């Protein structure tokens, strides 16, 4: 048998030296971010979100800034916080929606997602994640409507 080598799909965890199989480097980084968020508690979520947005590469950064502004305007009851190292927006401390930068996960698009706490139900099936390549006026209007519905 050949010795195992460390790849992006096999990481040593910090607890007990066990290997975490099936996680990419960005996924492992997101998990570490989440652990830091839980330990930090609900410190200044707005500042944390703005800092994470500032770290993003274009076009993710511009989209995240605009989505942040749309959410603040259309759903002021939501509070900004980070979630797995990405901007998220919560109601009663439960994440309702979040932005996921495409570059971080080597995806060809960013994502605006909604958790099961969002009121988006439409019959037996409905979308919860939306791919974003750019923010047009039509896309911004749809995001505004989705966010308002999610918190209704």
Regions found by a protein language model. Name each.
Residues 1-152:
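Charge-dense, helix-prone N-terminal extensions
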